[in-house]
């Protein structure tokens, strides 16, 4: 089957490889997409027919652009997050380790296709991680840190970081990402706790940061039963975070929630700045060349004054 529009061009593939990146989107269609992680490919699909079509188009596209891959994994995108399952292997050696390593501008990140629905790296945050390295903050607070990829980007530029996430396993993978890049963790803290509980504690201690990352899940539940809904709780989260931001600090406000478009993020950000009695301007990173217009996470950087 000849690949239809939606697949990246060969020159973009070469550009990624030239900059030391082998983790990125390969194709985006209405009912599915394909991503690359090192030598492996991950297909996300909404319908079985979409999966089969993407598999056939992948082989045709790969032959055309001379792209070699080792394995193909696939995962179904259900309507409810609680129904999400880890990807399944559909092509390749089943005896191989489900873990691999992907690179982004020469930084290494661990990928685990058996750890759950998310494999360890969100490729749509690539330009935001690039911005972190460019700004080179001194102290970064990474909320909902997951596998600490933002912190690795900051640490390679000399920052100290605090990483907060409910999952001890995710933070352990974050430590592994530091080790993959030969970054000692002695100046970095990993806190397995509820972000909404940690922020007030840090404020009481007088902690300040010149960069904060707020990329929460659409929904989460702490071991104590407290829930976080991004649509209703993001403003409260941002107001609390602003108490910890230095005067000229930067705060990333980002979400993958389909119900929150970029304009809604702006409205929330303006309200939160006013509530926290802070002033700032908005900054956006360039669009991702491997994503369609408006695709990927919605993100705004607040540059405080």
Q: What role is predicted for each listed range?
A:
Residues 1-40, 46:
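Non-catalytic accessory regions of SAM-dependent methyltransferases
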Residues 21, 27, 31-35, 54-122, ...:
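Non-catalytic substrate-recognition/targeting regions of SAM-dependent transferases
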Residues 136-146:
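Conserved class I S-adenosyl-L-methionine
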Residues 147-159:
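Conserved SAM-binding loop of SAM-dependent methyltransferases across substrates and taxa
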Residues 160-165:
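Conserved SAM-binding motif I beta-strand of class I
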Residues 167-213:
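S-adenosyl-L-methionine
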Residues 192, 210-240:
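Mobile active-site "lid"/loop adjacent to the S-adenosyl-L-methionine
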Residues 250-305:
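C-terminal catalytic and target-recognition region of SAM-dependent MTase-like enzymes
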């Amino acid at each position: 089957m000849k690949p239809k529009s939606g697949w990246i061009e060969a020159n973009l593939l070469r550009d990624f490889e030239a900059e030391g990146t082998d983790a990125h989107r390969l194709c985006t269609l209405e009912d599915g997409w394909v991503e690359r992680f090192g030598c492996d490919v991950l297909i996300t699909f909404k319908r079985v027919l979409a999966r089969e079509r993407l598999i056939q188009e992948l082989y045709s596209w790969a032959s055309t652009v001379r792209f070699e891959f080792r394995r193909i994994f696939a995962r179904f995108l259900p309507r409810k997050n609680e129904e999400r399952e880890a990807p399944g292997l559909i092509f390749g050696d089943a005896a191989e380790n489900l873990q691999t390593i992907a690179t982004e501008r020469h930084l290494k990140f661990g990928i685990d296709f058996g750890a759950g629905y998310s494999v360890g790296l969100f490729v749509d945050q690539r330009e935001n991680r690039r911005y972190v390295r460019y700004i080179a903050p001194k102290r970064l607070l990474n909320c909902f840190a997951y596998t600490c990829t933002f912190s690795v980007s900051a640490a390679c530029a000399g920052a100290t970081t605090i990483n907060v996430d409910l999952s001890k396993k995710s933070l352990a993978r974050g430590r592994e990402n530091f080790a993959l890049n030969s970054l000692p963790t002695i100046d970095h803290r990993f806190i397995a706790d509820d972000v909404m509980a940690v922020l007030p504690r840090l404020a009481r201690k007088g902690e300040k940061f010149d960069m904060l990352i707020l990329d929460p899940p659409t929904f989460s539940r702490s071991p104590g039963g407290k829930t976080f809904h991004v649509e209703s709780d993001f403003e409260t989260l941002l107001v609390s975070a602003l108490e910890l931001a230095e005067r000229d600090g930067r705060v990333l406000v980002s979400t993958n929630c389909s119900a929150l478009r970029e304009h809604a993020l702006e409205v929330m950000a303006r309200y939160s700045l006013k509530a926290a009695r802070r002033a700032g301007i908005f900054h956006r990173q360039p669009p991702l060349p491997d994503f369609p217009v408006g695709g990927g996470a919605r993100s705004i950087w607040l540059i405080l004054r």
